[in-house]
């Protein structure tokens, strides 16, 4: 995975968590605070979901209890694309750890898809990869990944 892709994944996880709170909150003050927190230069200095939760605790139980419930409900799955080595696979586990440590959010690393020229060829030919090469290495990756998702299994650390 490219560094830019990793950064984008962290940004997506953060913003989708904030959107979840805004969407389900019935408290205008909470929605406004979350909206403001999405700006890195907000007046409260909130930069992460963990910092948002700490700030909400200072404001009282109504908003912080709701946000804590949303934190427990929010459980995104992570899939790595274009993996080239075992070190790339370790990035998935590192991202799980970093999300919990810095964001206070649990993320499940479900698997990966290896880098493979068959994908590009499939896109250029506008034919589904699984129709062209279901038994290829990438086809097996996709089948394994689908099984992990359906069975809600995480990738064990190597």
For the regions a language model picked out, list residue spans one by one.
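Hydrophobic transmembrane alpha-helix bundles
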Residues: 2-20, 111-119, 144-156
């Amino acid at each position: 995975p490219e560094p830019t892709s990793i950064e984008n994944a962290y940004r997506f996880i953060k913003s989708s968590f904030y959107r979840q709170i805004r969407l389900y909150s019935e408290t205008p003050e909470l929605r406004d605070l979350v909206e403001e927190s999405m700006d890195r230069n907000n007046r409260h200095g909130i930069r992460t979901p963990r910092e948002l939760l700490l700030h909400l605790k200072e404001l009282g139980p109504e908003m912080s209890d709701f946000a804590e419930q949303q934190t427990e409900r929010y459980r995104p799955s992570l899939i790595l694309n274009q993996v080239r080595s075992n070190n790339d696979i370790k990035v998935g586990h590192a991202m799980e750890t970093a999300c919990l440590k810095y964001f206070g959010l649990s993320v499940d690393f479900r698997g990966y898809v290896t880098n493979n020229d068959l994908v590009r060829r499939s896109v250029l030919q506008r034919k589904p990869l699984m129709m062209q090469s279901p038994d290829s290495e990438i086809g097996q990756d996709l089948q394994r990944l689908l099984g992990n998702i359906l069975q809600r299994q995480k990738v064990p650390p190597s």
